[in-house]
Structure formats: C-alpha cells, structure tokens
C-alpha cells in the first residue's frame, strides 16, 4: 500500500537506549584461523556481532571481557579461545559533544555456569 500524505513515520528503534544479554558462539567464528590469531579475531568478531545486533559503529569492549577472551592466551599449550561467551550489550548515549556518533555500545562479560537454554533477553538497564 502507498502511504498517504498525512501519515507519520515511526521512530527508529536504533535511537533508543537498550540493554540486551546475548550468547556469542565464538568457535564457529574463529574456525580455520591460525592459533596465534584466534584471540584477536575473536575480539574483532565480537565487535562485528555487536555492530550488527545493536546498530552502532562505536563499540567499546570491557576489560573483563578482553581478559576472559585472552585467558587461554596464544601459547601452544591451550591454543584456543572460549567456545561461547555470554555478553551484555548496552547501547548508551555518548556524552562527548565532538563525537560523530550519538550512541555507543558497551560490551561486558557475564559469567554463566552453563550455556544450555539461554536466549537473547532484554535487560532492565541500570545506569552506573
């Protein structure tokens, strides 16, 4: 159907502040990657997943998540990143006036005992 002239367009949901909790399957994203490149590639894949999921170009990764990804290192002994990781994606307003992006996404690590039966959930955001 064609829109009539008087209809208002809906606001985009991308401009809202929202927090989601997701599971990222890292094993399929770093498959066939050399062992020395797995942790850096996992960080890049988390960024890519977050950009697609939240619709923001400015993605900031928390240090706890970075340490968890790098916990097994790149040595020959462990050789791998965690298979899955549970993260909280928080889209927030950017307070910096000279930034080109109005919103940014903060990615934080959520420790879970098991990944069974977890779904993507909207979380009530608590601003720190």
From Swiss-Prot:
One of its GO terms (biological process) is cytoplasmic translation. Keywords: Ribonucleoprotein, Ribosomal protein. InterPro entries: Ribosomal_eL31, Ribosomal_eL31_CS, Ribosomal_eL31_dom_sf. It holds the Pfam family Ribosomal_L31e. It comes from the Eukaryota. One of its GO terms (molecular function) is structural constituent of ribosome. One of its GO terms (cellular component) is cytosolic large ribosomal subunit. Belongs to the eukaryotic ribosomal protein eL31 family. This is Large ribosomal subunit protein eL31. It comes from Drosophila virilis (Fruit fly). The gene is RpL31.
């Amino acid at each position: 159907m064609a829109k009539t002239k008087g209809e208002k367009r809906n606001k985009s949901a991308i401009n809202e502040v929202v927090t989601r909790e997701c599971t990222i399957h890292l094993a399929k994203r770093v498959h066939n990657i050399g062992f020395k490149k797995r942790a850096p590639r996992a960080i890049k894949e988390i960024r890519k997943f977050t950009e697609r999921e939240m619709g923001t170009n400015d993605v900031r990764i928390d240090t706890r998540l970075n340490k968890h990804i790098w916990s097994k290192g790149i040595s020959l002994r462990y050789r791998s990143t965690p298979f899955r990781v549970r993260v909280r994606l928080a889209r927030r307003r950017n307070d910096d006036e000279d930034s080109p992006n109005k919103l940014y996404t903060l990615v934080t690590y959520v420790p879970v005992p098991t990944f069974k039966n977890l779904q993507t959930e909207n979380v009530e955001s608590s601003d720190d």
